[in-house]
């Protein structure tokens, strides 16, 4: 549903209902990023999502610039999560270590774009929260986080990005992209005990996802070379030279804890997947 105030201004509202039969479980405390997909069935109900949104849209200078803002709220039913101490690796009875709960997500999205000229780009920012409430199977079972709201693995308070491109001439085009995101929620141990000479971390069952991985950010650049079109060919090609994560940020994919062999204390071990990644790509189109 939309209402046009004038040729450059409009207000839009929307409602969506979606059903998902595959459920994702993530664990950032494993030595490597761990994602488990669980299908709906006798013990796992399909996930239902109701989304409400209202937005304001504005064009400037005959569409050379556009501004988009939107407020949204999502209500999610039957969202699963794993119980405290669950083993997600090689578990053939995953339904025995998960509980059904409900979740909510809400926030504000902002997007400003420059659409014309040799220099184009956009700035985007999202301020949001994503939380879950998961009670036990019975009234006597405490549930997750003592049956209180807690952050989901997808909760990113701040999500900021800038994209810019410059058409230098008919052959060369330069692009850059910067991304900053609040670190993913995680569980850190609050204590430890010794068992058969090994320090075992202890987690607070009432503080699910109370900690966070370090903030995620990176800067990418690329240059695109488009040679003059060969009139004898029916297709046009281009070369793309890029560098992903230019300044080599070691973004954390997960965080695990192990015993230091010198101090015999548990220490955090960060797993990072990508550092600086140069690339050369050749694209063609007919």
Language-model regions, residue ranges each:
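Residue-level signature of outer-membrane beta-barrel architecture
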Residues: 2-3, 46, 58-60, 112-116, ...
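Surface-exposed extracellular loop regions of Gram-negative outer-membrane beta-barrel proteins
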Residues: 3-51, 73-95, 136, 177-198, ...
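Short loop/turn motifs that connect adjacent beta-strands in outer-membrane beta-barrel proteins
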Residues: 6-8, 61-66, 118, 171, ...
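Transmembrane beta-barrel strands of outer-membrane/channel proteins
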Residues: 13-17, 35, 56, 67-73, ...
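C-terminal beta-signal and adjacent terminal beta-strands/loops
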Residues: 19, 76, 171, 180-199, ...
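Extracellular loop and loop/strand-boundary signature of outer-membrane beta-barrel proteins
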Residues: 33-42, 56, 93-99, 107, ...
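Residues that define the transmembrane beta-barrel architecture of outer-membrane proteins
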Residues: 48-52, 102-106, 115, 156-160, ...
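Gram-negative outer-membrane beta-barrel transporters
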Residues: 73-75, 94-190
């Amino acid at each position: 549903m939309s209402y046009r105030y004038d040729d450059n201004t409009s207000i839009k509202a929307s409602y969506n209902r979606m059903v998902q039969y595959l459920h994702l479980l993530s664990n950032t405390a494993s030595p490597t990023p761990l994602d488990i997909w669980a299908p709906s069935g006798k013990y796992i109900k399909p996930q239902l999502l109701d989304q409400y949104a209202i937005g304001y849209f504005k064009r400037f200078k005959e569409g050379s610039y556009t501004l988009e803002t939107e407020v949204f709220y999502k209500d999610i039913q039957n969202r699963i999560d794993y119980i405290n101490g669950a083993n997600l690796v090689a578990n053939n009875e995953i339904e025995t270590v998960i509980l059904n709960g409900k979740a909510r997500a809400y926030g504000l999205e902002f997007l400003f774009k420059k659409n014309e000229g040799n220099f184009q780009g956009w700035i985007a920012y999202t301020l949001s929260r994503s939380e879950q409430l998961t009670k036990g199977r019975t009234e006597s079972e405490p549930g997750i986080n003592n049956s209180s709201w807690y952050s989901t693995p997808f909760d990113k308070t701040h999500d900021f990005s800038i994209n810019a491109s410059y058409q230098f001439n008919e052959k060369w085009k330069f692009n850059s992209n910067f991304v900053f995101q609040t670190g993913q929620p995680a569980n850190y141990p609050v204590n430890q005990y010794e068992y058969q000479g090994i320090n075992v971390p202890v987690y607070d069952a009432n503080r699910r996802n109370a900690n966070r991985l370090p903030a995620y950010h990176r800067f990418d650049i690329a240059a695109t070379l488009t040679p003059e079109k060969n009139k004898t060919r029916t297709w046009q090609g281009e070369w793309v030279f890029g560098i992903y994560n230019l300044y080599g940020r070691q973004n954390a994919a997960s965080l695990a804890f192990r015993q230091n062999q010198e101090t015999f204390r548990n220490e955090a071990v960060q797993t990072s997947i990508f550092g600086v990644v140069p690339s050369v790509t050749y694209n063609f189109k007919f």
